[in-house]
Amino acid sequence: MAGHEVRYGKHRTRRSFSRIKEVLDLPNLIEIQTDSFQDFLDSGLKEVFEDVLPISNFTDTMELEFVGYEFKEPKYTLEEARIHDASYSAPIFVTFRLVNKETGEIKTQEVFFGDFPIMTEMGTFIINGGERIIVSQLVRSPGVYFNDKVDKNGKVGYGSTVIPNRGAWLELETDSKDIAYTRIDRTRKIPFTTLVRALGFSGDDEIVDIFGESDLVRNTIEKDIHKNPSDSRTDEALKEIYERLRPGEPKTADSSRSLLIARFFDARRYDLAAVGRYKVNKKLNIKTRLLNQIIAENLVDAETGEILVEAGTEMTRSVIESIEEHLDGDLNKFVYTPNDYAVVTEPVVLQKFKVVSPIDPDRVVTIVGNANPDDKVRALTPADILAEMSYFLNLAEGLGKVDDIDHLGNRRIRAVGELLANQFRIGLARMERNVRERMSVQDNDVLTPQQIINIRPVTAAVKEFFGSSQLSQFMDQHNPLSELSHKRRLSALGPGGLTRDRAGYEVRDVHYTHYGRMCPIETPEGPNIGLINNLSSFGHLNKYGFIQTPYRKVDRATGTVTNEIVWLTADEEDEYTVAQANSKLNEDGTFAEEIVMGRHQGNNQEFSASVVDFVDVSPKQVVAVATACIPFLENDDSNRALMGANMQRQAVPLIDPKAPYVGTGMEYQAAHDSGAAVIAQHNGKVVFSDAEKVEIRRQDGSLDVYHITKFRRSNSGTAYNQRTLVKVGDIVEKGDFIADGPSMENGEMALGQNPVVAYMTWEGYNFEDAVIMSERLVKEDVYTSVHLEEFESETRDTKLGPEEITREIPNVGEEALKDLDEMGIIRIGAEVKEGDILVGKVTPKGEKDLSAEERLLHAIFGDKSREVRDTSLRVPHGGDGIVRDVKIFTRANGDELQSGVNMLVRVYIAQKRKIKVGDKMAGRHGNKGVVSRIVPVEDMPYLPDGTPVDIMLNPLGVPSRMNIGQVMELHLGMAARNLGIHIATPVFDGASSEDLWDTVREAGMDSDAKTVLYDGRTGEPFDNRVSVGVMYMIKLHHMVDDKLHARSVGPYSLVTQQPLGGKAQFGGQRFGEMEVWALEAYGASNVLQEILTYKSDDVTGRLKAYEAITKGKPIPKPGVPESFRVLVKELQSLGLDMRVLDEDDNEVELRDLDEGEDDDIMHVDDLEKAREKQAQETQEVSETTDEK
């Protein structure tokens, strides 16, 4: 027997064909959400408060300080928040201290700071009753970047940018004349020496001393001349910078100083963030810049006078490691003191080294480092600016390297916690202005923190983020996989990110650093391709937000691959050589072969085993969760694999789903971590179990109660239904499944079913990927799903009195009320069709709505009883089904309702949808198609043992698409069905073709895995043997019931009077200009005329035509289309005297629309009246006939 048995939870064993020993379990798949939010609660929120506070008033006599914060218990539980359309949030109380600096008086007070949404255990938020997800954002990391560009003459120029987390950009660039310029915050450029002079190093010699001799420095100094001898060089430079930043304002050196300090050196206005400081120090670090350069001077220990490295030595990695302590200490540190006019007058510490120019061995180049400021320094320092300039000047000398902005070492993830912290900071900054003003205005003696703090800007900022940010998304809840995928999504769009139109090809493309960090396959098709990605299965964020991936460390001394796991970011990995997970190893962990396949930076090639530093932990670390669920992924073309991964996320939960015969072993973990199942929190024993709840007695005697969700409506309108797995007496361990969620079976993800599939054509019905299906799948509810729709009706107070929910509805017969209770609300379990009343409701009618006769009667008799019109909630088009639940919310019951609403009724209708012609089906390999025919079981082709085939697919769908994985799955699936086993074939480490054929033989199938098929209609065998097997097929969310649409009479647009468009508006089909040309080409003038008039926007014409048809009279001539009248009115509104003349030059009067038609649906009502009138006339005619 090929393969080995593997247990997945307590309910499933699979035969696995994997060969690689997994040394690391998959991490919790939603930790990117939960860990980030926990960090925010533990430290992020505190940091935001400490950033903004303390706040002083303008005279600096009062100060508001932050002490601490505390979350109290949430007002609603999760379930209550869902039912009441509320948010699942906890009140946050912040303690402030108000200090009066003049009297020394201190007032401490706890202030309510609003309700803050709390993340559920599943990694989601509940906002206004709907489940939402905050998608992590992929953004360019703050730091310093260098780039090169070739001009039209082929000359290479260089550029550099310092990008902060917030604050002004500082850029450097060269021009064609070899002069270096700087730009501050995207303004006009100035010679870079001007900025150096403003920093207090004004002499030309001083500048040359710092940066060393080079053409760029000399050319720039010559360009930057002293224009105004009455000013010092520093003052002149400051004024020049001020002129660029604030053109047109009077320039003084003092105002320029304070402006520059605010732009770059004030931590409250300029923030590199921890990650920015880390990246700047890393890039400008002297050790990486000296690597492999030849030193041009003796390196001497200042304390002992010992020569550490002699001039002429190549600074290899080992030489640098030997003097690392000195490099990190005071080796070659120089202190430069700026002059008194400088922006910052503190001494500047730089580290300076001289190396031999790689281009010209006779020249010496100076390298200046920023002496590694402390991690806590979040603003820029003069040393950073000078070191950046040095690196930039060194690029022209062939030292250093330019950055690739698509490298994942330069792009980082902003997860939930950080996005929330940023939003909270915005709110606090708005509050700060408010607080300052109140402190200054009010009397100091009576002030308390509560009085000066207005929390509205903070709560508004948080609400706005959750409610309307591009990154706060309604959770994709089609099935557990789509939930999981959504939580692990990485988007480059959103505030501070890219836009679809500006994103070029490079940003979207797969980059070598995506390996093990971002999935190269799972991304949407269409305009967002490559901008929305998914985290790879083992991907993990470090404290700076860079994605790390795990590797097994190789002990270089012994050459063994250890089980020690090292997590590397993309730029750390660039320094190493990594071998693939499938490299053959001996028993002792050494490489079995001298040459192994590996990766170093962007190169995939063969390496000697002795140079390998790390080995991949698993073959599936490359791909995301959805992609890792595709068996035989390695045999599929990547475009089809992309479709396969995306379509699994659109699977509809079925009534009785089945896990795949051929899986990848990923199904268990995906179901476990998705949050859709019920998982045991502690060890214990089941003491009670039914469909609604499970009780487990823990070992310490306490009782855990788990509630099972039955048929709740998901965000996608599908049934979210859990099924209990455990029985009384079962022993349960922490992490075990207590109940399956939707699309799960026995603790494994089960998106579809395992039908018997044949690759064959049948009467042409599977042309162009269409799917032919057996009626068995309909009758036995194999592909049946339950869909829930929610409808609501509310009663409000109107000017004419309150609306009422009642059974007493005017002009409605008893038949229509048969399923309503005494209140007028539909009973649970009632079967309803389109147009049936769900909630009977009447609204008071104004006097203007009454006819003259009715008004007269009211004036005489004061009869106010029937002044109501019917505004009941009815079943909309396509909404028929069975009433599953009714929820009633009233003020009396203490429910929170919107202002003006007295009562709210929600009705849930369940539909059972069997598979039908027009539904979309798919396999896991991107092989999708639409059901074209459902054939009776007796007519389907059958196997020699009499088993009818369930589905027939077109064999032409395979070769050109190159997704051969489906054929391998088909054969292996048939073998698994015959053997009665389930199989796991993990991606890139699954069943080989030998394993496949061995299993086929073991199952007793023919050697080519094909079979003779018999025609169900004639009993004759087909001419050729056919590939028949079991393939996992899923039903997708694109169902024909949601798409089929037809209109005869419906609403019209208000201005143009043309029918509305789209199924949602019950609209018509657009007859566009090209369709008009087609009818013109055939000379079908009458058809064309009625399409452009009666059927569209000839208002009087269509009424008369309707009347004529109902009375059986000839249809009158059409009038003028309304849109023509609109055109005339628009031209007249421009002041043009536009008149319409007929063929005899007489003016045609264009009728105005009747006044008071303020409702799109008015014209439908007119048609209804015409119908009633017609019915009345017919009745009169029949009565007179009867009399005769």
Curated annotation (Swiss-Prot):
One cellular-component annotation, GO: DNA-directed RNA polymerase complex
Subunit structure: The RNAP catalytic core consists of 2 alpha, 1 beta, 1 beta' and 1 omega subunit. When a sigma factor is associated with the core the holoenzyme is formed, which can initiate transcription.
SUPFAM superfamilies: beta and beta-prime subunits of DNA dependent RNA-polymerase (SSF64484)
Gene: rpoB
Database matches in Pfam families: RNA_pol_Rpb2_1, RNA_pol_Rpb2_2, RNA_pol_Rpb2_3, RNA_pol_Rpb2_45, RNA_pol_Rpb2_6, RNA_pol_Rpb2_7
Species assigned in the record: Streptococcus pyogenes serotype M2 (strain MGAS10270)
Reactions mediated catalytically: RNA(n) + a ribonucleoside 5'-triphosphate = RNA(n+1) + diphosphate
Name of the protein described by the UniProt record: DNA-directed RNA polymerase subunit beta
Entry coiled-coil feature ranges: none
Function noted in UniProt: DNA-dependent RNA polymerase catalyzes the transcription of DNA into RNA using the four ribonucleoside triphosphates as substrates.
NCBIfam families: PRK00405.1 (NF001616), rpoB (TIGR02013)
Classification via InterPro entries: DNA-dir_RNA_pol_bsu_ext_1_sf (IPR042107), DNA-dir_RNA_pol_bsu_external_1 (IPR019462), DNA-dir_RNA_pol_su2 (IPR015712), DNA-dir_RNAP_su2_dom (IPR007120), DNA-dir_RNAP_su2_hyb_sf (IPR037033), RNA_pol_bsu_bac (IPR010243), RNA_pol_bsu_CS (IPR007121), RNA_pol_bsu_protrusion (IPR007644)
Disulfide bridge map: none
GO molecular-function terms, A-Z: DNA binding; DNA-directed RNA polymerase activity; ribonucleoside binding
Family affiliation: Belongs to the RNA polymerase beta chain family.
